[in-house]
């Protein structure tokens, strides 16, 4: 785990808890995403790494964000600037969205197949995974022809390797032991 993740987590948790309390998860997600884009601006990045005072930096940052960030979001920016943590804003945004997905019981699932899957196959995989994982599933599909056949499914810590290549590897391991 990176240092920035450790630094970002309390800010993300505070923003998340506030957003849940005020029923503003989507708005906070948009604000944090916008503020993250501002940090990626070359000139802003120079200011963040420079020797500008915290008050001045917060003032400039809030001015650049304009109406895209409400008073509560501006307060978060000011607190982060006072603590010299504005460079962690992209990580705060990332942590916020992880908390949001967990709250909404949603999970990203990577589906790698040997060939393009039909809509029916994807719907079938999605519905079975939703039952097994007890979450809303968002499928991210890709094709890897080296699998020979079948699919590999990755959802968090869960990996289901039902590819021909995976089966051959397991058979080879079993024969060698």
UniProtKB/Swiss-Prot annotation:
Is Lyase given among the entry's keywords?
A: no
Where is this chain primarily localised? Answer: membrane
What compartments host this protein?
Cell inner membrane
Which Pfam families does UniProt cross-reference here?
Answer: OSCP (PF00213)
UniProt keyword annotations, A-Z: ATP synthesis, Cell inner membrane, Cell membrane, CF(1), Hydrogen ion transport, Ion transport, Membrane, Transport
Any one Gene Ontology cellular component term annotated for this protein = plasma membrane
What topology in the membrane does the UniProt record assign? Peripheral membrane protein
Q: Which InterPro entries match?
A: ATP_synth_OSCP/delta_N_sf, ATPase_OSCP/d_CS, ATPase_OSCP/dsu
Indicate yes or no for the key word Membrane: yes
Please name the GO terms that the record assigns under molecular function. Answer: proton-transporting ATP synthase activity, rotational mechanism
Entry-linked NCBIfam families: ATP_synt_delta, PRK05758.2-2, PRK05758.2-5
Quaternary assembly? F-type ATPases have 2 components, F(1) - the catalytic core - and F(0) - the membrane proton channel. F(1) has five subunits: alpha(3), beta(3), gamma(1), delta(1), epsilon(1). F(0) has three main subunits: a(1), b(2) and c(10-14). The alpha and beta chains form an alternating ring which encloses part of the gamma chain. F(1) is attached to F(0) by a central stalk formed by the gamma and epsilon chains, while a peripheral stalk is formed by the delta and b chains.
Similarity section? Belongs to the ATPase delta chain family.
- Relate the protein's function as given in its record: F(1)F(0) ATP synthase produces ATP from ADP in the presence of a proton or sodium gradient. F-type ATPases consist of two structural domains, F(1) containing the extramembraneous catalytic core and F(0) containing the membrane proton channel, linked together by a central stalk and a peripheral stalk. During catalysis, ATP synthesis in the catalytic domain of F(1) is coupled via a rotary mechanism of the central stalk subunits to proton translocation. This protein is part of the stalk that links CF(0) to CF(1). It either transmits conformational changes from CF(0) to CF(1) or is implicated in proton conduction.
Q: What is this protein called?
A: ATP synthase subunit delta 1
| Species for this entry | Vibrio campbellii (strain ATCC BAA-1116)
């Amino acid at each position: 785990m990176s240092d920035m993740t450790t630094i970002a987590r309390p800010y993300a948790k505070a923003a998340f808890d506030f957003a849940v309390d005020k029923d503003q998860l989507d708005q906070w997600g948009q604000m944090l995403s916008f503020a993250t884009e501002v940090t990626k601006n070359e000139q802003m990045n120079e200011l963040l790494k420079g020797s500008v005072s915290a008050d001045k930096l917060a003032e400039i940052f809030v001015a650049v964000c304009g109406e895209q960030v409400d008073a509560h979001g501006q307060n978060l920016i000011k607190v982060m600037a006072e603590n010299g943590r504005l460079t962690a804003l992209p990580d705060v945004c990332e942590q916020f969205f992880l908390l949001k997905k967990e709250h909404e019981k949603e999970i990203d699932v990577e589906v790698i197949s040997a060939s393009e899957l039909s809509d029916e196959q994807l719907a079938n995989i999605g519905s079975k995974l939703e039952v097994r994982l007890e979450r809303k599933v968002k499928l991210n599909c890709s094709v890897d022809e080296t699998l020979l056949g079948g699919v590999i499914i990755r959802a968090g810590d869960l990996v289901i390797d039902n590819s021909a290549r995976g089966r051959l590897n397991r058979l080879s391991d079993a024969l060698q032991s």
